[in-house]
Amino acid sequence: MTARIDAAFARCRAEGRAALVTYVMAGDPDPETSLKVLEALPKAGADIVEFGLPFTDPMADGPAIQAAGLRALKAGQDLRGTLALVRRFREGDDQTPVVLMGYYNPIHTYGVPHFLEDAQAAGIDGLIVVDLPPEEDEELCLPALEKGLAFIRLATPTTDEARLPAVLANTAGFVYYVSITGVTGTATPDFGRVSQAVSRITAHTNLPVVVGFGVKTGAHAAEIARGADGVVVGSALVDALARSLEPGDRAGSGTVEAVASLVRELAQGVRSAAKAPAGA
């Protein structure tokens, strides 16, 4: 199923631009609203969607995504329900890649073979599991690759030349460069250093390199897009959703549009930084 991811990057290259990768939490603030948000993302300009798996101990997530996960859990969202949302999304969209992002515990509890079967059937294209290092590839990474699911690794500012080959060894789909140290949504990246880091990674792999953590505005997205194959935005979208909620964390009449509006701004930023189209 990496074909959808490959096709998305190919389309962006043909247009001479980076891809916009958007993250939202599954089930936030409730499953039905979450599905509407998911459906709105590609229509607003997202090229790839990361769908977060709610978890009780999200160690790499900042306050915004932690709060989103708690709202989703309170609404009864679990891994089975998340796969069901993706199945429903696929009824109307068979083109946009969907990558599940989260932690290993819910997958382990579900059962790896069962999870991979159900993820493939639901139309999942890839996985980002932030707490499974390369040393544990046999747990999930290698079985996922055998099923045709991309297993996407994170590289960070502290990933040195000695560590990078291990990070890239079984990576598929794309490489996700975390532009800051710390948790999500807590700082703005140093754009100059990000470009240097992307160049360092691309010297070791032919995979697209996307950059996330700290991207909040269309201007930020444009800066990153000039030096990367893709721009990931998560906390800013989750924040936009949270600000739209009614008391009691209920979806408001403008909740879906609050997210879609920011995605349109981000998409415009990415497109404003367009490079020469591939082959031009």
From Swiss-Prot:
SUPFAM superfamilies linked: Ribulose-phoshate binding barrel
Annotated catalysed reactions: (1S,2R)-1-C-(indol-3-yl)glycerol 3-phosphate + L-serine = D-glyceraldehyde 3-phosphate + L-tryptophan + H2O
GO molecular function: tryptophan synthase activity
Keyword Amino-acid biosynthesis in annotation: yes
One Pfam family matching this protein: Trp_syntA
EC number: 4.2.1.20
Pathway entry: Amino-acid biosynthesis; L-tryptophan biosynthesis; L-tryptophan from chorismate: step 5/5
Keywords assigned by UniProt, alphabetized: Amino-acid biosynthesis, Aromatic amino acid biosynthesis, Lyase, Tryptophan biosynthesis
InterPro entries, per the entry: Aldolase_TIM (IPR013785), RibuloseP-bd_barrel (IPR011060), Trp_synthase_suA (IPR002028)
Major enzyme class: lyase
Record carries keyword Kinase: no
Active site positions, chain numbering: 50 (proton acceptor), 61 (proton acceptor)
GO CC annotations, alphabetized: cytosol
Subunit structure: Tetramer of two alpha and two beta chains.
Family of the protein in this entry: Belongs to the TrpA family.
PANTHER family referenced in this protein's UniProt entry, alphabetically: TRYPTOPHAN SYNTHASE ALPHA CHAIN, CHLOROPLASTIC, TRYPTOPHAN SYNTHASE, ALPHA CHAIN
Reported function: The alpha subunit is responsible for the aldol cleavage of indoleglycerol phosphate to indole and glyceraldehyde 3-phosphate.
Protein name stated in the entry: Tryptophan synthase alpha chain
Organism this protein belongs to: Methylorubrum extorquens (strain CM4 / NCIMB 13688)
Gene: trpA
